[in-house]
């Protein structure tokens, strides 16, 4: 599992993911669950104007571009990957009640999810191939 973060900074996610992929290949490990963010690729359509133009457009643009590069590395890795795209992290308890795999046309998500629920979903996907080579969004 890969859940690397660096706040607003760029470069950390892609570089860390590159190292994880290399280590997995060297060890013969094939299953990778990688946490990215809602808004990458086709999930851009799930975002509201605040996230599209203010947050990812201005304030955390380097982090956004880092996620784009990270996802490219995962897709090209040759591993059995799933890229999880959670909405904005919030503090909160594990609820086990969240939406996942919604289409890019869904515009009724809350655009937030607890870290505990993100971890729950990622752990479940280690043994579930429903989202193998897919990029499910994750939100309340």
Please state what every model-predicted region is:
Residues 10-14, 48-49, 59-69, 108-116:
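Short-chain dehydrogenase/reductase
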Residues 1, 32-37, 84-86:
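SDR active-site strand-loop-helix element
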Residues 88-106:
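NAD(P)-dependent short-chain dehydrogenase/reductase
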Residues 71-92:
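Conserved beta-loop-beta element that borders a ligand/cofactor-binding pocket
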Residues 27-32, 103-140:
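Mid/C-terminal beta-alpha module of Rossmann-like enzyme folds, strongest
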Residues 42-44, 77, 93-99, 125-134:
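Glycine/proline-rich active-site loop of Rossmann-fold NAD(P)-dependent oxidoreductases
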Residues 1-19, 23-26, 130:
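NAD(P)H-binding glycine-rich loop region in Rossmannoid oxidoreductase-like domains
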Residues 18-62, 70-71, 76:
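Conserved Rossmann-fold NAD(P)-dependent oxidoreductase catalytic core, especially the SDR/UDP-sugar
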